[in-house]
Amino acid sequence: MSEAKRLAAEKAIDYVEDGMIVGVGTGSTVAYFIDALGRIGHRIKGAVSSSEQSTARLRQHGIEVLDLNHTGTLSLYVDGADECDPNRCLIKGGGAALTREKIIAEASERFICIVDPSKQVPVLGNFPLPVEVIPMARSLVARQILALTGGQPVWRDGVVTDNGNVVLDVHNLHITDPVALERNLNQIPGVVCVGLFARRPADVVIVGGETPRVL
């Protein structure tokens, strides 16, 4: 699947225009995009990064990493996904960067999601849904998620997000209404961010392959 990821990432470069500040996500597919972006780094003004991991890789390529507070609205955000449904709703957060990813997606006019074919699903939920949580609320949030969804929340032990929080991965979900679930989970006190990108789905999904498909 690594070749499919690379091909999806290379196709996303077609959406990068001269003078842009590019929002950049996190993960193995995005790493290929950053490498491709490095080849045209002289054409862009810089990037806004969703994680320390991506920031380090961008800087290795000599791309300036900018503060979103100083850039205003971004023209383009490119990121991967753990799952993608036919409506371009996503599960994201396997790399624990979901909060910053969601902030940058919200701040961007266009959100391009790059995936390999294994990430396409008819219904979201086979991949455990990440939820970023304030540490003191971990048990409270887990109980409320169980009561609300019937899914099984599992603490991702040993993982601390770039924001200093913890992650619960919710297993055994069958998400037929991702917009409603995103809204309801966000209302639980202690939840920082839910790894459902449904209220703000991707605008374009690029599925890697010998001939990448654009959805």
UniProtKB/Swiss-Prot annotation:
Catalytic site:
E101
Q: Which GO terms describe its cellular component?
A: cytosol
Reactions listed under catalytic activity = aldehydo-D-ribose 5-phosphate = D-ribulose 5-phosphate
Keywords from the named record:
Isomerase
Write down a Pfam family by its short name.
Answer: Rib_5-P_isom_A
Query: Which residues, by range, are in coiled-coil regions?
Result: none
Q: Tell me which EC number(s) this protein carries.
A: 5.3.1.6
| Keyword flag Isomerase | yes
Q: Which InterPro entries match?
A: NagB/RpiA_transferase-like, Ribose5P_isomerase_typA_subgr, Ribose5P_isomerase_type_A
Pathway in which the depicted protein is active: Carbohydrate degradation; pentose phosphate pathway; D-ribose 5-phosphate from D-ribulose 5-phosphate (non-oxidative stage): step 1/1
Tell me the GO molecular function terms: ribose-5-phosphate isomerase activity
Q: Its Gene Ontology biological processes?
A: D-ribose metabolic process; pentose-phosphate shunt, non-oxidative branch
Instruction: Give the protein's biological function.
Output: Catalyzes the reversible conversion of ribose-5-phosphate to ribulose 5-phosphate.
The annotated subunit structure for this chain is: Homodimer.
State the name under which the record lists this protein. Ribose-5-phosphate isomerase A
- Which lineage is the organism of this entry classified under, starting from the top rank? Bacteria, Pseudomonadati, Pseudomonadota, Gammaproteobacteria, Lysobacterales
